[in-house]
């Protein structure tokens, strides 16, 4: 009997597998890859900020655009990179392996929390394209600055709420995994 090689999966098969996976290792890698995409995007925002500050009286960005880019840079670095890559992506990959478990306790909740995280990034970036533009409130959303109105602020706040929901689901899944397995 001859040993047959497993046929290579096509691009669509691999994409479908990533879209429908509930494997904690794949989801952890997807979290990390998406967080590093957010890191690269925040790096582009940082380059725009540095370009504006390169020479005195630079007109590369208006004051409002500068504040919007500064807000997007800070919030993207904090909410979409540091927390997600450092805790969620790494935790998804490592925690079940450290426990000797085959998977997390709630794999579908784990997958949903990733897709909610990705949706939060999309909402945050969409805020730039609505009337009023992206929020220019700083990443802290401190009240005197956050009193501005506009659809961009609403979309960005919806993104932060969706990200919080995603984090709650993911962390509840970690707690259930550690407690039950």
Question: At which residue positions do the language-model features occur?
Answer:
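...captures the hydrophobic TM-helix bundle architecture rather than a specific catalytic motif
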Residues: 1-181
């Amino acid at each position: 009997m001859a040993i047959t090689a497993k046929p290579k999966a096509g691009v669509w098969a691999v994409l479908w597998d990533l879209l429908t996976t509930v494997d904690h290792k794949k989801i952890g890698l997807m979290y990390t890859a998406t967080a590093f995409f957010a890191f690269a995007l925040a790096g582009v925002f940082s380059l725009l900020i540095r370009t504006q500050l390169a020479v005195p009286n630079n007109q590369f960005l208006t004051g409002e655009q500068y504040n919007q880019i500064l807000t997007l840079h800070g919030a993207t670095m904090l909410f979409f990179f540091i927390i997600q890559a450092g805790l969620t992506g790494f935790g998804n990959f490592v925690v079940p392996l450290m426990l000797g478990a085959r998977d997390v306790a709630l794999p579908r909740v784990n997958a949903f929390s990733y897709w909610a995280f990705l949706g939060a990034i999309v909402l945050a970036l969409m805020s730039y394209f609505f009337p009023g533009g992206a929020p220019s409130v700083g990443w802290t959303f401190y009240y005197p600055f956050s009193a501005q109105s506009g659809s961009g602020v609403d979309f960005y706040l919806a993104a932060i709420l969706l990200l919080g929901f995603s984090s709650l689901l993911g962390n509840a899944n970690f707690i259930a995994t550690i407690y039950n397995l």
